[in-house]
């Protein structure tokens, strides 16, 4: 009994701190300097009977700060944080969040920017966070949880908590001598673009360009100044060795014009006149009209398409191939023009010799592209038929509701997705977006054939809300054939590609996932 009493007294007297002891945890959401909160927490803590101990002096905030100055140092708690970070999330929550982000982004992009001439209000002194009533235990949200309104949102009487309001005055720091967030963002963007451009130039200038590294760097977009050379390398038109490139260019250009001299004069022969006539009819229907309707450009496109059709009798000329010439030609011609708008490039100021070389480069790069998707344009176009079927199965797995909605209104995938495969989405996107899309296609293995399938799936699901709102076959088909992408930019394409990559990662190596 005596030993039991001693053991009992021992546990009563033990006040040493051990790992796992219950202590109050303070953070940005629960500041230790809030007297009301501190008192509330102390009152809500149940008292444990202990032996009388000497009262401790109340710690000041300076002591608290010094005692917790190493709160962010690496310690044993890091393992718990890493474990929490690796916990799997609910797939439905992830999908819903992704769709909501894409939808909100689209709504912000579709709203025209409105400039007001009202003077900006003078900055008001930063107010301290309001103290909650004594009966209300709700706390002010932390910076990461507070809602920052978009410029398009209407402001009411209640002002959401901003970052500068939730931090002490000393934490509000002005960077680069300016407080304008837009100026800071533009400056950071400019520095990042300059850095990426330097990386491209270093890769391209080396004696032997590392094509694998070039593909990785090109996936997220290629800067305009280095895009022509990068496309020629990624398409396989030019060799990686710098010293061999001039000779290869000269040889290929000479070979192309030998084809023209040999074949082009036969365009009006009975055996070829139908092909040439169809090309002559299709070119004025292409876009952008400001470029295509220039006589020099029309002649260049006619020669490129006719020579390709003659040299590839297995497929010949098929409508849709003509659209694939435009991105290459525009990218190569922009190297010699200062106009930023790719839809309105004027070739009248480009020397004739330069135009000849661009024509040859365009032909060979387009030929390299078509070599990988030629089954799309052979008899009955089996490649497109197969890809449309795969798209239908893929969409039925990733968004069954959209799939059932289309099927319930008797909308067949061939009715809208055939053009997506035949023209590689060129009729659905502005030319500037197509060029950005092709940056990634050329850096992806089988980008124009395999990865394009996942881009089409992400593109269809991107319009989920609008599709589900349509309740009529004609309205559904009209919407799917005229998608509102006129205001899209590189950021929209990047979001589309990111979603497509996620789908590829989930389904590409698991073909059984296509089927239920």
From Swiss-Prot:
The gene is Tbc1d22a. Keywords: Acetylation, GTPase activation, Phosphoprotein. PANTHER family: TBC1 DOMAIN FAMILY MEMBER 22A, TBC1 DOMAIN FAMILY MEMBER GTPASE-ACTIVATING PROTEIN. Residues 107-116, 143-179 have a biased composition (Polar residues). Homodimer. Interacts with ACBD3 and ARFGEF1. Interacts with YWHAB, YWHAE, YWHAG, YWHAH, YWHAQ and YWHAZ. Residues 221-445 form the Rab-GAP TBC domain. The modification Phosphoserine is found at residues 144, 166. It comes from Mus musculus (Mouse). This is TBC1 domain family member 22A. May act as a GTPase-activating protein for Rab family protein(s). It comes from the Eukaryota. Pfam families: RabGAP-TBC (PF00566). Residues 122-133 have a biased composition (Pro residues). Residues 63-88, 102-186 are annotated as: Disordered. GO terms for molecular function: 14-3-3 protein binding; GTPase activator activity; protein homodimerization activity. The modification N-acetylalanine is found at residue 2.
């Amino acid at each position: 009994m005596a030993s039991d009493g001693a053991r009992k007294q021992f546990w009563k007297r033990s006040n040493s701190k051990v790992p796992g002891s219950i202590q109050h945890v303070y953070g940005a959401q629960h500041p230790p300097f809030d007297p009301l909160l501190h008192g509330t927490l102390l009152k809500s803590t149940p008292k444990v009977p202990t032996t009388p101990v000497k009262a401790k002096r109340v710690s000041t905030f300076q002591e608290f700060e010094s005692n917790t100055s190493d709160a962010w140092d690496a310690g044993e708690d890091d393992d718990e944080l890493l474990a929490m970070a690796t916990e799997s999330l609910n797939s439905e929550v992830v999908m819903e969040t992704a769709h909501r982000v894409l939808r909100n982004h689209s709504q912000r992009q579709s709203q025209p920017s409105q400039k007001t001439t009202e003077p900006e209000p003078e900055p008001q002194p930063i107010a301290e966070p309001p103290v909650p009533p004594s009966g209300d235990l709700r706390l002010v949200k932390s910076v990461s949880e507070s809602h920052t309104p978009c410029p398009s949102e209407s402001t009411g009487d209640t002002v959401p908590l901003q970052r500068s309001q939730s931090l002490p005055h000393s934490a509000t720091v002005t960077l680069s001598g300016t407080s304008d967030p837009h100026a800071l963002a533009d400056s950071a963007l400019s520095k990042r673009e300059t850095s990426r451009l330097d990386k491209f130039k270093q890769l391209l200038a080396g004696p032997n360009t590392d094509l694998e590294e070039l593909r990785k760097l090109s996936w997220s977009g290629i800067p305009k100044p280095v895009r022509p050379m990068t496309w020629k390398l990624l398409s396989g038109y030019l060799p990686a060795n710098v010293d061999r490139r001039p000779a290869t260019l000269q040889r290929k250009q000479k070979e192309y014009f030998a084809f023209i001299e040999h074949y082009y004069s036969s365009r009006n022969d009975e055996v070829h006149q139908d092909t040439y006539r169809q090309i002559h009819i299709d070119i004025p229907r292409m876009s952008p009209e400001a470029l295509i309707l220039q006589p020099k450009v029309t002649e260049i496109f006619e020669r490129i398409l006719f020579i390709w059709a003659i040299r590839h009798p297995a497929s010949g000329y098929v409508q849709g191939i003509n659209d694939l010439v435009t991105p290459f030609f525009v990218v190569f011609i922009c190297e010699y023009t200062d106009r930023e708008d790719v839809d309105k490039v004027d070739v009248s100021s480009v020397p004739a010799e330069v135009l000849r070389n661009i024509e040859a480069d365009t032909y060979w790069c387009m030929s390299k592209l078509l070599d990988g998707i030629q089954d799309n344009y052979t008899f009955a176009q089996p490649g497109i038929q197969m890809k449309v079927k795969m798209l239908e199965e893929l969409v039925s797995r990733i968004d069954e509701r959209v799939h059932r909605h289309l099927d319930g209104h008797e909308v067949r995938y061939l009715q809208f997705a055939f053009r997506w495969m035949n023209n590689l989405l060129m009729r659905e996107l502005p030319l500037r977006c197509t060029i950005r899309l092709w940056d990634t296609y050329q850096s992806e293995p089988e980008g124009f054939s395999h990865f394009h399938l996942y881009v089409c799936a992400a593109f269809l699901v991107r319009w989920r809300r609008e599709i589900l709102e349509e309740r009529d076959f004609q309205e559904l088909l009209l919407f799917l054939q005229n998608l509102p992408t006129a205001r899209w930019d590189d950021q929209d394409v990047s979001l589309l590609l990111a979603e497509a990559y996620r789908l590829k990662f989930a389904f590409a190596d698991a073909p059984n996932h296509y089927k239920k």
